[in-house]
């Protein structure tokens, strides 16, 4: 299986601009990418990063500490292939689907809660000529596996519903993958809560995920007000 | 397994008051309860409703059309036992845990996306003397299975983290159940989006869930603005 991780290298995570500066958003996006790449390699697959611009995984990714169950041929993070395609997400992903000669998995780079277990379930899902989708909040397509040669993505709007419809049109059986972890993408300040709550369960070694660690370094902590949990940032 | 569904019968879903009147909130809460009870009965378990006040399931629940895989002894919705306990949620649930002589599952009544498959996975999770929790957004405890005799709940705040800590204190192994469907409780207007997106996959018969149908009857439809999906209400 060809596992592709699209990554917006240039202006990542603009919806977090209320709480994070541009360099902080870049650092957080890199930490999430590193967590996602680690989780994928721990399933035994070698991911390909589909980046909007050239990217050094060795120096900017902080994913040099790959899991011990690294797939053959992957010695360090710098061995993870990076494909540069500066087109919008949908066009870049469809180029990957068109060129593919094997099943393709597309895993978003901001699935900071992704675990090897959740990804393994995803990769094993879907019929031999079908499509499997892990939906996100608001009808997003957070991760999918494409085994039908004619399936193409369109990430605009409620893409999960559009992808269901498209799959039905081309006769591709569609399976919905039920995962809270894959369903949680980090786009908005409220999503940071999930990283801090679940970050310690995400890392394979029982430690904390890179994303959670980075958030704490930036001063974020959980805060409970009126029975509801939010994040607060200490800028001292 | 004793499956308990706590239900706030009197003033349900106050956080939806921006978009729904009190009688509409009551109707929506009843539809969600009916969907949850149907999904539980389809797993072969007889749920008990733990209600804050007396409740007629036959006339107010719209769950008279039980699934065909109804457990033995459950002929109609009016056979679903209702226990009335007007104490706050935590106290009422802990009374159930204290009295239990078998494993107890607590499933919130607003898990409108719950499917028999997701619930079956939950019910089968957790060690013989442990606890299994399906967390919700913001660290909530949306559903759990308790097999350790000393485990007690506390639903205030980030209850998922508190429950993890409590389980560790009493030596109960804790398993986190990874489910988008069980992780989605319907509390706020933004959650209604999920009901409309996934409602058609939720009903066992391939139709639409009662909750989604009720929302459409109330005039709610999905709306895509700037690539993001919200609900809009047509009050005409």
UniProtKB/Swiss-Prot annotation, chains A, B:
GO molecular function: GTP binding; phospholactate guanylyltransferase activity
Reactions it catalyzes: (2S)-2-phospholactate + GTP + H(+) = (2S)-lactyl-2-diphospho-5'-guanosine + diphosphate
A Pfam family this chain is assigned to: CofC
Enzyme class: transferase
Source taxon at top rank: Archaea
Transferase keyword on record: yes
Gene Ontology terms: biological process: F420-0 metabolic process
InterPro entries associated with the record: CofC (IPR002835), Nucleotide-diphossugar_trans (IPR029044)
Keywords: GTP-binding, Nucleotide-binding, Nucleotidyltransferase, Transferase
Gene3D superfamilies given in the database record: 6.10.140.50, Spore Coat Polysaccharide Biosynthesis Protein SpsA, Chain A
Record EC number: 2.7.7.68
Entry keyword Transferase: yes
Pathway recorded for this protein: Cofactor biosynthesis; coenzyme F420 biosynthesis
Entry similarity comment: Belongs to the CofC family.
Function according to Swiss-Prot or TrEMBL: Guanylyltransferase that catalyzes the activation of (2S)-2-phospholactate (2-PL) as (2S)-lactyl-2-diphospho-5'-guanosine, via the condensation of 2-PL with GTP. It is involved in the biosynthesis of coenzyme F420, a hydride carrier cofactor.
Assembly, per entry: Homodimer.
UniProt name for this protein: 2-phospho-L-lactate guanylyltransferase
Organism: Natrialba magadii (strain ATCC 43099 / DSM 3394 / CCM 3739 / CIP 104546 / IAM 13178 / JCM 8861 / NBRC 102185 / NCIMB 2190 / MS3)
Lineage, highest ranks first: Archaea, Methanobacteriati, Methanobacteriota, Stenosarchaea group, Halobacteria
Encoding gene (name): cofC
